[in-house]
Amino acid sequence: MNVAVVMGGYSDESVISLRSGQLILNNLDKSKYNIFEVHILLKDWSVVIEGEKYPINKADFSFTKNGVITKFDVAINTVHGTPGEDGHLQSYWELIDIPYTGCNFYQSALTFNKRDTLSVLTKFNIPKAKSIYLRKGDVIDGNEIKKALGLPFFVKPNQSGSSLGVSKVDALDQLEKALEFAFAEDNEILIESYLNGTEVSVGVLNYKGQTKVLGITEILSQNDFFDYEAKYLGKSEEITPARISKEEEILVAESAKKIYNSLGMSGFSRTDFIIMNGIPHFIEINTNPGLSPQSIFPQQAMFAKMDMPQMLDNEITLALSRKPIWKK
């Protein structure tokens, strides 16, 4: 079976994705699969073999080496941000009938859009921060935002990952800079009220037909919040299992599973919460969580005594069992 381990992306998250892809390459069972490293970058789609690059034929996601055309039986998607986490790659693979891991194009697009995710979860009574949605060019009144949300508050790109473009605003004179920072990542932003509590992250996946919670990790950032530096440059402490009460642990696990199932997820995911007054408040869900050695999801898999090669086998089995929507 030819397996494409797809990594990279078009955003600043591509560096993290390349690290995630390496973990997958190192943990796939080479006795079961013919494994290929595939880079999808803005100006370069290619297969990398012993340092040499072979261009991907986008018509059918194949490549040619020494006159021999190789096609893939399944794609393992580790692309963070666009186009691998927002539904674009998933739609492409659906159209050319390539099975792929993770959730489908609709769930990917939905969960990459913070506003739309929050709107859907409102139906399921999931506690969350208050928020204001704005687009570039809208009239923005800092005093009205303060009145609605209080201080401090967070300014976030509506569609971005790895906390890129996120700022905490403690005073209104910081708002203009925060808006510029967020709008540099996206033309839409969310402004959210501050939740004062314990931040936790929860790995969830579909494993052998069951929705399974891997573990709950407590996040202690050296910065004001769990930003890019804290996530990837060692500016945080991540404690698994989280130092929370048994009641809180149960509530967080139940909420994470409810969100996963309510949104129709499949594959690996990571859901972030702030526990405030004993109640977990939803922050966001990541449908292509980081898999670098520094990332939370692999740490939680180790805590749960889950074998990464077996987890990847499970992902491939799920991908092969799912038919494209147009074939149903």
UniProtKB/Swiss-Prot annotation:
InterPro entries: ATP-grasp, ATP_grasp_subdomain_1, D-Ala_lig_Van_CS, D_ala_D_ala, Dala_Dala_lig_C, Dala_Dala_lig_N, PreATP-grasp_dom_sf. Mg(2+) 1 binds at residues 272, 284. Belongs to the D-alanine--D-alanine ligase family. The keyword Ubl conjugation does not apply. It catalyses: 2 D-alanine + ATP = D-alanyl-D-alanine + ADP + phosphate + H(+). It is found in: Cytoplasm. ATP binds at residues 146-201. Binds 2 magnesium or manganese ions per subunit. GO terms for biological process: cell wall organization; peptidoglycan biosynthetic process; regulation of cell shape. One of its GO terms (cellular component) is cytoplasm. PANTHER family: D-ALANINE--D-ALANINE LIGASE, D-ALANINE--D-ALANINE LIGASE B. Pfam families: Dala_Dala_lig_C, Dala_Dala_lig_N. Keywords: ATP-binding, Cell shape, Cell wall biogenesis/degradation, Cytoplasm, Ligase, Magnesium, Manganese, Metal-binding, Nucleotide-binding, Peptidoglycan synthesis. This is D-alanine--D-alanine ligase. Its EC number is 6.3.2.4. It is an enzyme of class 6 (ligase).
